[in-house]
Amino acid sequence: MIFIHIIKIKSSFNHFSQSSDGRSNGGGSSSGDSVSTTSDGLLTTGTSPNTSSTSLDGLLTTERTIVSSVLLDFQLLDLSSQRGTITDTVLTSDTNLLSSFSPVFKKEKISKYVSKS
């Protein structure tokens, strides 16, 4: 009964449509030509889930995230090297820079902190 079922499976794989190079019919390799059960008297054993280790999906996702963040760091370094240097010092050339904060802070609070120190 199993043997007949395997023959049906094998015969259904032999009727692929012809591809451009003629290899889907098994002419290129013999990996799919002899479909059969396990040979040499080897038996398979049952397996149980391994709950003490991480799954492969979780491991691959973590590796993908680490690689992505490392590549992002390289892209940021590349962008930073394309910038020019600032030749003029901003703080010494703009003497009224601190006066732009006066609408935000009241002068009384600023003078209170300045007088204590």
From Swiss-Prot:
Compositional bias, Low complexity, is annotated for 31-56
Q: Where is this region: Disordered?
A: 16-56
The disruption phenotype is: Deletion results in the overproduction and secretion of inositol to the growth medium.
What other facts are recorded?
Partially overlaps RPL43A. Disruption phenotypes caused by deletion of this gene may also be a result of a defect in its overlapping gene.
Q: What is this protein called?
A: Putative uncharacterized protein OPI11
